[in-house]
Amino acid sequence: MLIWALLSSVIFVGSNIFIRFYLGSVHWLALIWSRALGAALILGFLVYFNDPKELFLSYFTEISNRPLLWLLTVSTGFLGIWGFIKSIKLLPLYIVIPFTTLNLVTVLVSHFRLNFLIENVTLIGIFLGLIGLFFLLKSHYSSKNKNGWFWMILCVISWGLAYPLSQSLIQSTSPIFFATAMEASVVLGASLLLVSLNKSKRRQVLSTLPSPVFYSWMVTLLVLGVICDGIARESVSPISMLAFAGFSEIGVLVLGHFFYQERMKSIQWLGAFLTLLAMFLVLA
């Protein structure tokens, strides 16, 4: 089953390049919708191959059993995505990308089952949510240039919290189930934000989104990546998945170096380090 993990990483390299750099530079809504459309397509496959009534009943049961945990997981993941996009607009990519790859550390933390982190993560998540809301409001009344580091740190912390939260959910459900539910929840938040905009602003946002042909290609990549990742996680250890996630990040960094030559001159050294780290983890 290692072939599925490898295939997942190769596919994610291509999709991450465009999602993180192209869609992120177009508009944050474009990035979120691209992931949500992929989740919707995966849900379509699940409905096609399973009993729809039983499938949606299992969704409802899972969410109703632990609603607070689901809410915190989705909100921290959403804050992480938002913080990443805001930091891309305010800081050079050679600063943003290395810091946001710190979320790989949380995979290691979860692998060694540091339960004290998961036990206290609910209170931390609530506290982080309040801080995140404060920064969102504050950004409307202060200079954009001063907030770049704020958003990047918020992104790293949010993703760091979202991962152990999501791991505790994945323990009782399949990875594909979880990925679909979480992405669908995120697009609901994006839709509510879009509805809250006035008519002219909404038209301006929608006019910046990529073409349907581009979306079709991007969503196909995401679906293939998530399906391969879900199959791989059923039989591959978390430490091996960390290694392949490292390879995926390396691809994003190296290809990003060629697309943004003038802005990422030193990134290949980080890529080389991550390559060695990933190889060590695979062999270990």
Residues of each region from the PLM?
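Short hydrophobic/small-residue motifs within alpha-helical transmembrane segments
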Residues: 9-10, 74, 101-102, 157, ...
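Alpha-helical transmembrane segments of compact multi-pass small-molecule transporters, enriched
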Residues: 38-42, 99-114, 185-189, 225-226, ...
